[in-house]
Swiss-Prot record:
It is found in: Secreted, Cell wall. One of its GO terms (cellular component) is extracellular region. It comes from Pinus halepensis. Keywords: Cell wall, Secreted. This is Unknown protein 1. Its main location: secreted.
Length: 9
């Protein structure tokens, strides 16, 4: 899940 890494929560 790359989205989670780029999400920058």
């Amino acid at each position: 899940v790359l989205d989670e890494l780029t999400a920058d929560r």
